[in-house]
Amino acid sequence: MDISIISDKNNPLLYRREIKFTVSFDAATPSIKDVKMKLVAVLNADKKVLVVDTLDQIFGKLEAEGYAKIYNDEKAMATIETKSVLEKNKIEEEAAEAEVAEE
């Protein structure tokens, strides 16, 4: 999976960076969680404040266009983003921590 950044714009009014990107892949369209983790690595961002808003498949190509936001802090993200978008981007950290605690 390769990610290329189309635009990276700072939006100080909403305390965030807005990123438009394309994702190239070999098989099925990657999940939002997979794209989010790849963006965290590419942009060197904190996964707690990065939100993948949209990920749209381009018809007939093994590519998808996406829109992500990186907030300055979690408080701004919780105030501005809708609950559905936050749930869609939630990473199951609690489940991973529970597995470690059981061992």
Swiss-Prot record:
Q: Which GO terms describe its molecular function?
A: structural constituent of ribosome
What is the name attached to this protein's record? Answer: Small ribosomal subunit protein eS24
GO BP term, pick one: translation
The UniProt family comment states:
Belongs to the eukaryotic ribosomal protein eS24 family.
Q: Which InterPro entries match?
A: Nucleotide-bd_a/b_plait_sf, Ribosomal_eS24, Ribosomal_eS24_CS, Ribosomal_uL23/eL15/eS24_sf
User: Could you confirm whether the keyword Ribosomal protein appears in this record?
Assistant: yes
Enumerate the UniProt keywords alphabetically: Ribonucleoprotein, Ribosomal protein
Keyword Ribonucleoprotein tagged: yes
One GO location term (cellular component): ribosome
The family database entries (SUPFAM superfamilies) matched by this protein are listed as: Ribosomal proteins S24e, L23 and L15e
